[in-house]
Amino acid sequence: MATKIFSLLMLLALSACVANATIFPQCSQAPIASLLPPYLPSMIASVCENPALQPYRLQQAIAASNIPLSPLLFQQSPALSLVQSLVQTIRAQQLQQLVLPLINQVALANLSPYSQQQQFLPFNQLSTLNPAAYLQQQLLPFSQLATAYSQQQQLLPFNQLAALNPAAYLQQQILLPFSQLAAANRASFLTQQQLLPFYQQFAANPATLLQLQQLLPFVQLALTDPAASYQQHIIGGALF
């Protein structure tokens, strides 16, 4: 890359010297320094013996002095600006080529924190745009934990009862649907209360389960519509 830049500079320097060049025979010993303007210092003139270095030395001498600008400098300015922009572009590309592998190595070496940062990026953006919503997001796990804790507190007496007296806990489990029914529909709860002795008998003697299941439709019909229940008894007696 450096060789290409140097070659480009040499070509630009030679192209700038073609217009004002003076041809000397190969056997001639005429100093190249005689081509330089007379207002340049003698030290600069003695150094500029190489034709390839003449434009570069001339530019340095003019930049260091306060003399009026020569037409040669105006010819070289666009070329120099082009070279400078090219050099800056090449440097930026080289820097990018050097930095990107380092970033990739860091990301591969520390992938877990990088992925965590990517996961938390929406929350960071949310905290910047809407702090109130971000605070709610932060409090969400605590709200869920509070809900679970309240449920545990409600179930704590039943858990203690199950540990101390399993039979009483079983009765509580049997009566739990009735409690929920009482909260939802009071009329149905009263009906279930009338049927409660049958359920208690079932809890005491599981052998009566089949009889209770067979009689349950008739009992419910008797509680809801006594006239229809009486007709069912008449029809049942006629059949048997």
UniProtKB/Swiss-Prot annotation:
Keywords: Repeat, Seed storage protein, Signal, Storage protein. It comes from the Eukaryota. The keyword Ubl conjugation does not apply. One of its GO terms (molecular function) is nutrient reservoir activity. It holds the Pfam family Zein. Residues 1-21 form the signal peptide. Belongs to the zein family. Zeins are major seed storage proteins. This is Zein-alpha 19C1. It comes from Zea mays. The lineage of its organism: Eukaryota, Viridiplantae, Streptophyta, Embryophyta, Tracheophyta.
